[in-house]
Amino acid sequence: MATTDIISLVKNNLLYFQMWTEVEILQDDLSWKGNSLRLLRGRPPHKLSNDVDTEHENSLSSPRPLEFILPINMSQYKENFLTLECLSQTFTHLCSPSTERILLAIINDDGTIVYYFVYKGVRKPKRN
């Protein structure tokens, strides 16, 4: 699956199935192992997790923060394409400096998409 197809599939999933708003494909890209990585950015309809403790998220009147999404194909994931160095380069070159996490969108051959949080650095486990 081509990079543009992967990005379009994730964008449509976020907009029409997950009900995100303000989803856009960022123009900057990162060349990694012969592939081009591009991020999406968008606003989820609700808080995605309870581990980000910021004041503006507790306010009902303020919008949810924008999230960054990195779409990759399952075959790239299996081939050790996604390494710590790749993620570090993604945070450094494609995200804003204040970004603490990105959503990794892994697309299977059947079109299924799963989302995982990837944090910048080591994080203390959250309490339930």
Curated annotation (Swiss-Prot):
<dbReference type="GO" id="GO:0000214">
    <property type="term" value="C:tRNA-intron endonuclease complex"/>
</dbReference>
<keyword id="KW-0819">tRNA processing</keyword>
<dbReference type="GO" id="GO:0003676">
    <property type="term" value="F:nucleic acid binding"/>
</dbReference>
<dbReference type="GO" id="GO:0005741">
    <property type="term" value="C:mitochondrial outer membrane"/>
</dbReference>
<keyword id="KW-0472">Membrane</keyword>
<keyword id="KW-1000">Mitochondrion outer membrane</keyword>
<dbReference type="InterPro" id="IPR036167">
    <property type="entry name" value="tRNA_intron_Endo_cat-like_sf"/>
</dbReference>
<comment type="similarity">
    <text>Belongs to the SEN15 family.</text>
</comment>
<keyword id="KW-0496">Mitochondrion</keyword>
<keyword id="KW-0539">Nucleus</keyword>
<comment type="function">
    <text>Non-catalytic subunit of the tRNA-splicing endonuclease complex, a complex responsible for identification and cleavage of the splice sites in pre-tRNA. It cleaves pre-tRNA at the 5' and 3' splice sites to release the intron. The products are an intron and two tRNA half-molecules bearing 2',3' cyclic phosphate and 5'-OH termini. There are no conserved sequences at the splice sites, but the intron is invariably located at the same site in the gene, placing the splice sites an invariant distance from the constant structural features of the tRNA body.</text>
</comment>
<comment type="subunit">
    <text>tRNA splicing endonuclease is a heterotetramer composed of SEN2, SEN15, SEN34 and SEN54. Interacts directly with SEN34.</text>
</comment>
<dbReference type="InterPro" id="IPR018593">
    <property type="entry name" value="tRNA-endonuc_su_Sen15"/>
</dbReference>
<dbReference type="GO" id="GO:0012505">
    <property type="term" value="C:endomembrane system"/>
</dbReference>
<dbReference type="Pfam" id="PF09631">
    <property type="entry name" value="Sen15"/>
</dbReference>
<dbReference type="GO" id="GO:0000379">
    <property type="term" value="P:tRNA-type intron splice site recognition and cleavage"/>
</dbReference>
<dbReference type="InterPro" id="IPR042777">
    <property type="entry name" value="Sen15_fungi"/>
</dbReference>
<dbReference type="InterPro" id="IPR011856">
    <property type="entry name" value="tRNA_endonuc-like_dom_sf"/>
</dbReference>
<protein>
    <recommendedName>
        <fullName>tRNA-splicing endonuclease subunit SEN15</fullName>
    </recommendedName>
</protein>
